[in-house]
A protein has these predicted regions:
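N-terminal glycine-rich phosphate-binding loop and ensuing alpha1 helix
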Residues: 2-48
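Histidine-centered beta-alpha loop that forms part of the nucleotide-sugar donor binding/catalytic region
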Residues: 9, 70, 104, 134-135
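Short, high-confidence coil segments that cap the C-terminus of an alpha-helix
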Residues: 42, 95-97, 126-127, 220
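Short beta-strand scaffold positions
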Residues: 47-49, 173, 204
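Short phosphate-binding loop-to-helix
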Residues: 52-101, 110-113, 117
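Conserved core of the sugar-phosphate nucleotidyltransferase
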Residues: 81, 85, 99, 108-196
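Hydrophobic helical membrane-anchoring modules
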Residues: 194, 199-236
Length: 236
């Protein structure tokens, strides 16, 4: 049993109601729901939320709803705790999940092929989890006592830099029993799914992020699964 959980807390501070803002013609969350429902490998699609309006829109889009308790919907609550709670609640109305796919609704630049590749990688390598990552193009380092400390040799060309990757938030696949037992989405053995930098640009936290993601989604719309029916009407 493979379940997709879409964690959608209602209390975003930087971009209020971001999960249900109109995005390319439909509420943002509906794009993730439509994608998850389009994949034959996924048996159930669930939205975990503490927000009534988000729940209504997600239900109309075809997702099951797990009402998230207030203690799991604070600024300090982890995604893993919400996903673990959702899995336990879903087990009350059906078979326990073997695998959970976590799809964050604020990452709409996600193709069916990316999620399918993540599932295939999980099945093939049998890690604790799969995490989508993207190669970093930046020269990074911390600032301590008002001074920048480069984590590389100053003057080093980009092509000389050791390869490093960052977590992009597009897709996570994990053993469901691990998530419910430990509230950990990753475990020790994390298999990386390397994806194109384009798709990593869709991690929405601010209005600028939203505008950039919507521009790219519209430009490359043929790559994505589009919501239909009631969900699309809800954006009007």
């Amino acid at each position: 049993m493979m379940i997709a959980v879409i964690p959608a807390r209602g209390g975003s501070k930087r971009l209020p109601k971001k999960n249900i803002l109109p995005f390319a013609g439909s509420p943002l969350i509906c794009h993730t729901i439509a994608l998850a429902r389009s994949l034959p490998a996924i048996d159930r699609v669930c939205v975990s939320t503490d927000d009534d309006e988000t729940a209504r829109i997600a239900r109309e889009a075809g997702a099951e709803i797990v009402v998230r308790p207030p203690e799991l919907a604070t600024d300090r609550s982890t995604t893993a705790s919400a996903v673990g709670h959702a899995l336990l609640k879903l087990a009350e109305s059906g078979p326990r999940a073997d695998v959970v796919i976590t799809l964050q609704p604020n990452c709409p630049l996600r193709t069916a092929a990316i999620v399918t590749d993540a599932i295939d990688l999980y099945r093939r390598e049998k890690p604790d989890s799969v995490m989508s990552v993207t190669k970093s193009q930046h020269k990074l380092g911390p600032i301590e006592n008002g001074r920048f400390l480069p984590a590389y040799r100053p003057g080093m060309r980009s092509q000389e830099m050791p390869e490093q990757y960052f977590e992009n938030g597009v897709v996570y696949v994990a053993r469901a029993d691990m998530v419910t037992a430990t509230e950990d989405l990753f475990g020790r053995a994390i298999a990386p799914l390397i994806i194109d930098p384009l798709y990593a640009l869709g991690d929405i936290d601010t209005l600028l992020d939203f505008q950039v993601a919507e521009f790219l989604f519209t430009k490359y719309v043929e790559r994505f699964v589009l919501p239909t029916g009631l969900a699309a009407k809800g954006a009007a």
